[in-house]
A protein has these predicted regions:
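Residues lining hydrophobic/aromatic ligand-binding pockets adjacent to catalytic sites
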Residues: 1-173
Length: 173
């Protein structure tokens, strides 16, 4: 199984839909904690869901379970209230239910997890959700609509962890 991710940034909805179609995506799971944007209002929840429906793509909101800014105060650094502690989020039942829902959806339809940030390296799609999926041996492909894509594979993740444990660090992988 492969789960895709995409960040909408501030491009037009037509561009995102075109990219999603090119990957055969049938369902978008929106993992924004707040599915509204002043900078990209075309991606406000109801409007974007309608655009996707017209394109034959299902829209599912999952930010209440898989959002990057959880409501649970125990998920934040006590010394920096803006810093989310992803290792704490991962322990929460509501997060695990969200992951189970994502996996169920992905067994039924080609699925893309969507957030606002285009670069997955700066988004909880990579920093949290992809890491959980990799731990379950699920491949993750980050779609970069501004050019290219990047894969995260469970085998590579295992090698990176082993190299880190042996003290080799980033220079090895």
């Amino acid at each position: 199984m492969t789960i895709y991710t995409i960040g909408h940034s501030n491009v037009e909805t037509g561009k995102i839909i075109e990219v999603l179609r090119s990957y055969g995506i049938e369902a978008v799971l929106d993992v924004r904690s707040s599915p509204y944007s002043r900078h990209a209002p075309q991606f406000n929840r109801e409007d974007f869901a309608e655009e996707l429906a017209l394109a034959g793509i299902d829209y599912i909101y999952g930010g209440n379970h898989l959002g990057g800014k959880p409501k649970d105060p125990s998920c934040y650094d006590e010394n920096d209230e803006d810093r989310v502690l992803y290792e704490e989020v991962e322990k929460k039942d509501w997060y695990q239910r969200g992951i189970e829902g994502l996996l169920q959806l992905a067994t039924e339809k080609w699925t893309a997890v969507m957030c606002a940030e285009e670069d997955p390296n700066h988004c909880h799609r990579h920093l949290l959700i992809a890491q959980t999926l990799l731990d379950r041996d699920i491949e993750v492909q980050h779609i970069r609509h501004k050019g290219g894509e990047s894969w995260e594979e469970p085998a590579r993740r295992t090698l990176e962890r082993e190299a880190e444990q042996l003290g080799f660090g980033d220079e090895w992988t």
